[in-house]
Design a protein with these regions (language model features):
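Catalytic pocket-lining loop regions of alpha/beta-barrel enzymes
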Residues: 1-125
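Mid-to-C-terminal alpha-helical segments outside catalytic/metal-binding sites
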Residues: 51, 59, 100, 110-114, ...
Length: 171
């Protein structure tokens, strides 16, 4: 009901991972490196195969950490969507309802471009992990990656603020 109401009101829903309690392999920093991006990816997967995006067509979600593993595993995701859902849709159909932030905490143009190739310039929002991560890495690194990306300046400005203004209805 919450997701349906958010869609009715035009509110985007921010999906941020939680600690995976009781998972013994999540030690020595692996939660931040793998756990949270995995948790985000799993949540989105469950929303796709559970029909949430199909049932709530106006739902818009913002995924932290550049969508976790979603942009990197599109082929595998599409294979499994075909096998495990009745909706006959591809990941590329669902991403119209998804936005991702740039909180990958570094100057990785390559990571940004993988997300860009799936989500396009309109569905990427500037984001950071500050204050939990050093601001130079989280904010400065993400800014540097966007500025260095081989995309038009107008799209960089969209990512740096224009998309968020549009999504939140403040433009």
């Amino acid at each position: 009901r919450i997701l349906r109401r958010a869609a009715e009101l035009g509110f985007p829903v921010f999906i941020h991972p939680m600690d995976l309690e009781g998972i013994s392999f999540m030690d020595k920093g692996s939660m931040g490196a793998f756990g949270w991006p995995f948790d985000t990816s799993l949540a989105v997967w469950r929303m796709m195969v559970g029909g949430v995006f199909d049932e709530i067509s106006g739902l818009r979600v913002v995924l932290h950490h550049m969508g976790g593993m979603i942009p990197f595993f599109r082929h595998r995701i599409n294979q499994r969507l075909k096998k495990y859902t009745e909706f006959n849709r591809r990941l590329e159909d669902y991403v119209k309802q998804m936005y991702v932030d740039t909180a990958v905490d570094g100057e990785s143009v390559a990571d940004l471009m993988v997300a860009y190739s799936l989500f396009g310039p309109r569905n990427i929002l500037f984001g950071s992990d500050w204050p939990y991560i050093d601001p130079q890495a989280s904010i400065g690194g993400n800014m540097a990656a966007i500025r260095a990306a081989p995309i038009p300046d107008v799209e960089k400005e969209m990512i740096l603020g224009g998309n968020a203004e549009e999504l939140l209805g403040i433009r």
